[in-house]
Structures are given as C-alpha cells and as structure tokens.
Amino acid sequence: MSKMLDDLYLPDGKRLTTQIVGKPGGGKSFYLRETLMSFLKKNDDPDYRLLYICPKQEMRLGEKDIPVSVDKIAKNMRKNRATIFYPNPYDVEAEVDYAIELMFDMQQQNEGFKATIVVDDAQTFISSRKAASQAFRRLALTGRSKGIRFVAVAHQAVFSKDLEGSTSYLVMFTLPVKLYHKDLNTRYGLDVEPYIEPISSKPYSFLWFDVTKGKAQLYDPIEV
C-alpha cells in the first residue's frame, strides 16, 4: 500500500501525473479520500502541502479540513498541510487557474516546498475539445521539475496532448464505452478489452495502468 500511495501522490521529481478515472458511484471518491488521508499520515515532510480543488464542493478529508474560498488558500496553506478549495461556481476557471499559479509562487518563495494538486472534474478544464489554460499547461508540463505533482480526477481518461505525454498512471474504476477504446489504446497504450468483465463484475475494484511501463493490474476494492 505504501508504494501505491507514493505512486499516486508523492511529488518526488520523477513520477508524472496520475489520472483517477470513474463515473459517479464507481468507488472513485471513496478511494481518493481514504488514500489521501493515508498518504498524509505517512508523509511527515513539514514542507509538503496538499491542495484539493473541488468544483463540485463535495470533498471533505476530515472534520478539521474545512473547505476554503480562493482568498483563504494562502493563509490556510501556512497553517495546514491539507487545503480543500471550493471555487466559486460563477468564476470557477479563473479561480482554479489562480490557485494553481499560487502554488508555483509558493514554491518559488519557500525552499524545499513540495505539493500535490488534486483537481476534481478535471475534464472541465482540460480535454480534447478545449485548449488547456496556461496554468494547466504549466502544471502538467513543468510541475514535476518544481516539486508539484498533478492528480487529475475525471469521469474518463483525459484526451489532451498536454496531459497524454505527462501521465505516469491511469487508475480506472469504470472503463470507457467502446467508442473510446481505440483512443485509449492509441494515446496511452492501454487495451481495456480484457478488463471489462472483471471490473464490471466486482464493484469498486479498479484497474491500475502504468503508462510508462505499459503494464496493467487489477485490484480488489481497498479495505479500510
């Protein structure tokens, strides 16, 4: 489990983006919450920070992790290792871009600073139909070298040139419809056909695909 947590979230300058994919009800949110809490417990680096960006305004990690608005992110970061950010739904894209750029500013101003930025509903901000903002391009393409790890949470694998070449792991709780099987194989090298029946027959199980090594592994639901 320890290696899985590091593969998911650790900003070590080696691992690239993690995509955690699944439709509502597939177990994705539970997995996120439990693995993030476990990672925070095991990682005692005082210079580490987690920023969870949740446009749906649903994620809570614990009773002490009170969600904040955009103007409270920096203050909360100074005091707490984890910050849950609920962007204003009427200005969501601008606020999310600001939050990402703020993390890069903090990295420049604080020696040893390391962070994981989890973006829920990532398909809203980066997809094949929409060019990524400068902030998201910076996060996806240069975050690793700055000690900032990107974790994209989406309903399905994100098809975007900005993300395809900078993804280390796909963690899939539901598999895409047949229409997208070819794209997934072409862009990430994953053939999902052998895993459709096992995933669908065991609720909350998931497929872990190492994009760099081209290796896939099925996992049973995590135990708490």
Residue ranges with predicted function:
Residues M1-G13:
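Pre-Walker A adenine-sensing motif
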Residues D12-T18, N80-R81:
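Pre-Walker A (Motif I) flank of P-loop NTPase domains
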Residues T18-S38, K56, P89-V192:
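Conserved P-loop NTPase motor cores
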Residues V21-K72:
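Walker A/P-loop NTP-binding active-site region of P-loop NTPases
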Residues P46-Y48, N80, K146-I148, G165-Y169, ...:
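Short glycine-/polar-rich loops that comprise or flank the Walker A/P-loop
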Residues E58-D65, K75-K79, S160-G165:
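Short loop/helix-cap segments at secondary-structure boundaries that form the rim of catalytic
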Residues K75-V96:
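Conserved P-loop NTPase mechanochemical-coupling segment
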Residues H181-V224:
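Phosphate-binding and hydrolysis-coupling loops of NTP-dependent motor/remodeling domains
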